[in-house]
Structures are given as structure tokens and as C-alpha cells.
Curated annotation (Swiss-Prot):
Component of the small ribosomal subunit. Its main location: cytoplasm. GO terms for cellular component: cytosolic small ribosomal subunit; nucleus. Belongs to the eukaryotic ribosomal protein eS19 family. This is Small ribosomal subunit protein eS19.
Length: 147
């Protein structure tokens, strides 16, 4: 592994997610749905995301989460990307994220062969996906060491 055995856990996570999103976008293989520019990411959100590359960032964040905890499915992903639903004068409650977005991200990552279905339920990283993530983590570590 480049970077002397650096893994995803060893680098700054925000920089890693940004680098992985750039890698996914540059590869051009991630299938992005047509509706990405008009969708909200959860029912508790008031507006659609401002960033045009949000699908790549969500995919990178999802892959990172699968690296840290394998066997995670769509149900777990919608809880991770959930948040506080503001109900005006009524008390706030937790609201889950969009199930369709979580499912489409996982399906797109499966098409890239980074993620596969786990026989015990959920999804897990493939060996190729783990290799790619460790390689990108090594690049992030080397870049942060230079600056």
C-alpha cells in the first residue's frame, strides 16, 4: 500500500471523503440518476442540496461508512443520514433520510464493483473496494504530510 500501510481510519475523514468523491467523479463510471438536481435528501430538509456534486459526496461517505462497519443496509443508511424534523411550534422529532437516495447510491456502487451484497444482510465492501479506499487514503495522507 502506498503511504506505508495507511488505512481510511488514519486520515482526516473530510479530506478523505472529498478525495474519494473526486476519484468517483473523475472515473466517470458512477451512474448518477437524472433526478439528482431536483431532489431533497430527506423529508426533514427544506431545500435541495446546494452542491452539484452531492451524489458523489454521498457515495463516498457511504463507502467510507461501509469500510468502517460492514453489513450495513438501506435501513441503516437512512438512519445515518437522518436528522431533526422541525415542526414549527410543536416539538422536534427525528426523521430518517431518503430511502430512494440511499438505495440508488448503493446500487451505483454495486455497479462499480466496490460494494457487494452480504449473505447475512446488507452490503459490504469488495476486496477491490477496500484496496481502492486504502490507496486513496494513502494519497490523502501523503498530501497532508506535504502541506
Amino acid at each position: 500500500m502506498p503511504g506505508g500501510g495507511v488505512t481510511v481510519k488514519d486520515v482526516n475523514q473530510q479530506e478523505f471523503v472529498r478525495a474519494l468523491a473526486a476519484f468517483l467523479k473523475k472515473s466517470g463510471k458512477l451512474k448518477v440518476p437524472d433526478w439528482v438536481d431536483i431532489v431533497k435528501l430527506a423529508k426533514h430538509k427544506e431545500l435541495a442540496p446546494c452542491d452539484d456534486n452531492w451524489f458523489y459526496i454521498r457515495a463516498a461517505s457511504t463507502v467510507r461508512h461501509l469500510y468502517l462497519r460492514g453489513g450495513v443496509g438501506v435501513g441503516s443508511m437512512i438512519k445515518i443520514y437522518g436528522g431533526r424534523k422541525r415542526n414549527g411550534v410543536c416539538p422536534s422529532h427525528f426523521s430518517v433520510g431518503s430511502k430512494n437516495v440511499a438505495r440508488k447510491v448503493l446500487q451505483a456502487l454495486e455497479a462499480l464493483k466496490m460494494v457487494e451484497k452480504d449473505p447475512n444482510g446488507g452490503r459490504r465492501l469488495t476486496p477491490q473496494g477496500t484496496r481502492d479506499l486504502d490507496r486513496i487514503a494513502g494519497q490523502v495522507a501523503a498530501a497532508s504530510k506535504k502541506s
